[in-house]
């Protein structure tokens, strides 16, 4: 599941976001384009990273939903990136695709940082 990303645009993104909250270990990442949570989550799986992409000129699903979702995810200590792109409407724009590829290839999930912080230094394979 860790290598699986659910990707959705608009209603498909809404379904992907909802599925990640309903099914444990379904995926490691959710990429929502021009989408939103049906209801803002009260908790989120530690194993999921949320990547939200939204056009600021979206007249179907307002970009404020992405901002509110990101704020809530941060508040509940979930792993999230959020990108609101100016002059882009309700579409999967090439700039969003570029950002999605960048997020998939460069973003280190928060859970990995936590694992490193919680690791016992005596367990290190490096010997001095």
Indicate where each model-derived feature is located.
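Short beta-strand/loop motif that positions the catalytic acidic residue
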Residues: 51-54, 58
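Alpha-helical and His/Cys-centered functional microenvironments
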Residues: 15, 58, 94
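A short beta-to-alpha transition loop/helix N-cap that caps and shapes the active-site region
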Residues: 37-42, 60, 92-93
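Primarily recognizes the serine-hydrolase "nucleophile elbow" in alpha/beta-hydrolase
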Residues: 3-47
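Active-site-proximal beta-strand/loop segments in catalytic clefts of secreted hydrolases
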Residues: 33, 55, 85
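C-terminal catalytic histidine-bearing segment of alpha/beta-hydrolase fold enzymes
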Residues: 64-128
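Short helix-terminating capping/connector loops at secondary-structure junctions
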Residues: 1-2, 112
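Short, proline-enriched alpha-helix->beta-strand connector loops that line the catalytic pocket
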Residues: 2, 45-50, 76-79
